[in-house]
Amino acid sequence: MSFSDRLTRAADIARRAHNHQTRKGSDVPYLSHLFAVAALVMESGGSEDQVCAALLHDVLEDAGVGWSGEIRAELGEHVLALVVACTDGLPDAEGHKESWRTRKHRYIEHCLQDTPLAREALVICAADKLHNLRSLLIDLREHGPAALLKFVKDEPELRDKGEATLWYYETLLSIFERRGVSTARLLRPAVDALREIVRDLP
């Protein structure tokens, strides 16, 4: 499969939107995550629209809805719709987001929708969750359970954070497997590894 210059334009929007952002709790440029997710979508046979949306899947959530006009103008309505479908909650006018659990329940509801757009978006969502969980597992192995402290802000206890994180990934894995998303086969061993870690939390 060959790609048009739309992919270059998507990458440039991602660069400008996320250029000064880093991965949570680290100095790793946020762009690394976006390119990793796009690569996973390519490897699973994703379309050009899906790869472009993978590069942009966090733009509205992390850089603001003001980018939607440029995404639409440069890449089309369908790519924007995919980005919206992959978005995990938008901040309000003051920049505040809903609670972690509220956002995750809503995200799961979106993943359960059985529409052509939702099925396309699942390919991107699965790639996103796979890369996020792989990164979390690396952090857990390098830094121990304390790596969970930067997640699930509305759960005060470490074990509760771990169990909430495991619930989220297990629920999504079940959806991806039922819908036949190919990346689920890679996500399953990562979820199994997380389950072992959570089981041993104090």
PLM features: residue spans?
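Active-site helical microenvironments for divalent-metal-assisted chemistry
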Residues: 1-202
